[in-house]
């Protein structure tokens, strides 16, 4: 196993960004990471693209990374899409690390890109339901409602402040 080094990082500011899409958010973060690493797109051997919710928000499925990265000029290299709920970005990073440590690539890029906020906040929150066992979701809702009441809350987190 070879030693692996993180040679560059990049990120976008946190925000709602109603006017932006996953492509533009990913491009901003990737540009910063490549500049930080002093690496060009042509130096990449592979990309691990982590995204969990784009299919629910925009309908883009199966080739999320290929679509986002092609718009940025990255193509004709292996692009692996990964989804692992809240650990999606960490999973992309782990897979990139494995690729380099195992000698399969010299330069691997890990990307975690999400566009979660949408104007329809009811739909936005419903999107999270699919991250649970759909066969028992009603039982889970009842259980959580009872637990919330035990701690002085209201059903659905009624006294939780909203930031949007």
Task: Label the predicted regions.
Residues 2-5, 14-17, 54-107, 111, ...:
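Conserved catalytic cysteine-centered active-site region
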Residues 10-33:
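N-terminal phosphate-binding or glycine-rich loops at protein starts, especially the Walker A/P-loop
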Residues 31-45:
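Phosphate/pyrophosphate-binding loops at sites that engage ATP/ADP/AMP, CoA/4′-phosphopantetheine
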Residues 158-164:
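Short, intrinsically disordered, charge-balanced linker/junction segments flanking boundaries
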Residues 8-9, 51:
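Pocket-edge structural micro-motifs
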């Amino acid at each position: 196993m070879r030693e692996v080094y993180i040679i560059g990082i990049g990120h976008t500011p946190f925000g709602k960004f109603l006017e932006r899409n996953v492509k533009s958010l990913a491009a901003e973060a990737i540009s910063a990471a490549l500049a930080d690493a002093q690496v060009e797109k042509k130096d990449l051997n592979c990309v691990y693209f982590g995204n969990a919710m784009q299919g629910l928000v925009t309908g883009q499925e199966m080739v999320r990374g290929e679509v986002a990265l092609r718009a940025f000029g990255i193509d004709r290299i292996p692009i692996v899409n990964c989804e692992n709920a809240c650990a999606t970005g960490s999973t992309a990073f782990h897979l990139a690390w494995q690729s380099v440590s195992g000698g399969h690539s010299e330069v691997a890029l890990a990307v975690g890109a999400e566009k979660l906020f949408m104007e329809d906040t009811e739909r936005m929150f419903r999107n999270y339901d699919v991250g649970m066992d759909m066969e028992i979701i009603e039982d889970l809702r009842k259980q959580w409602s009872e637990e919330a009441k035990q701690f002085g809350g209201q059903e659905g987190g009624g006294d939780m402040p909203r930031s949007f």
